[in-house]
Amino acid sequence: MLGWIKCLMRMWFQRVGVSMQSVLWSGKPYGSSRSIVRKIGTNLSLIQCPRVQFQLTSHATEWSPAHSGEDAVASFADVGLVATEEGECSIRLRAEVSSKPPHEDDPPCFEKPPSRHTSFPSLSQDKPSPERTLASEEALQKISALENELAALRAQIAKIVTLQEQQSPSAGCLDSSTSVTVAPPPPPPPPPPPLPLVLHQSTSALDLIKERREQRLSAGKTLATGHPKKPDMPNMLEILKDMNSVKLRSVKRSEKDVKPRPADTDHAAFIAEALKKKFAYRHNSQGETERGIPKPESEATSEPALFGPHILKSTGKMKALIENVPDS
């Protein structure tokens, strides 16, 4: 079955004019032999569809009745004319729209060319409109009036507080019969300063608010820096940064403080002495039994210990080792 399919594919490729090796084993990432579809498309005689062509024209070269036959190619200006035509649904060319003679009763209208809608912001900044400048001036006036009212209210509150503080000690000294004199009303606040007549167009209400907020923050920082701060904890990094440059001096010790060094001893002799001390009682007990020295009654009557060196079996290796060690 696979051989039949392979034969069929080879015959089909030969009819088209493509070799099977160039299709399967060609590693060329470009050209007509990149894929089977491109190879078939190059060999087949297909009629390409005509492409739509647009012509970019400037506003100065508008349609004129003198050369009505020319400029028949559709351009992007036709798209704008079609968009402005709200009454009719059919699409027409700019030449057909402009060929209509204008009515005598209609006033001449001067339309500006259709603007191209782009997703990028315009680099040229437009000048602020007079309505916008008037709105910003009104906002500035309102903000300044509110700030003046706040300042006047603060001044009145401060005066009331000072009068209450002055009257509180004097009220205790007066008798109950005497009536407390009512403080006169505070004087009216001073009128707000006149606003400048000429305001720069670029300044707005938000910019003014930001500037005054920055001034208040800077004033608060200056007050905070005026008071002396408490000394903080010392920084250990600053203390330890000069540790490498510290030099130590040598100090002589007294003979009493110096500990005597142990003398160099032979390790074999030290081990032999320890073994002799450990197994001395055993040799003594064996010598007494061999000599026939009677044990005391207290030792004979006493019960043997459950655990101890007597449980171990005696061998002659340890005895020979002790005898071979030279006496120090």
Swiss-Prot record:
Which gene specifies this protein's sequence? Mtfr1
Q: Which GO terms describe its biological process?
A: aerobic respiration; mitochondrial fission; mitochondrion organization
Q: Which residues span the membrane?
A: none
Similarity comment text for this entry: Belongs to the MTFR1 family.
Modified positions (Phosphoserine) in chain numbering: S119, S129
Which portions of the chain have biased composition (kind: Polar residues)?
116-127, 166-181
Biased region (Basic and acidic residues) positions are 95-106, 288-298
**What is the name of the protein in this document?**
Mitochondrial fission regulator 1
What InterPro entries does its record include?
A: Mtfr1
Tell me the null mutant phenotype: Mice are viable and fertile. However, oxidative DNA damages appear in the testis, associated with a reduced expression of genes encoding enzymes with oxidoreductase activity.
GO cellular component assignments? cytosol; mitochondrion; plasma membrane
Compositional bias segments (type: Pro residues): 183-196
Expression across tissues is: Ubiquitously expressed with higher expression in testis.
**Pfam families in UniProt:** Mito_fiss_reg
Give the coiled coil ranges.
131-167
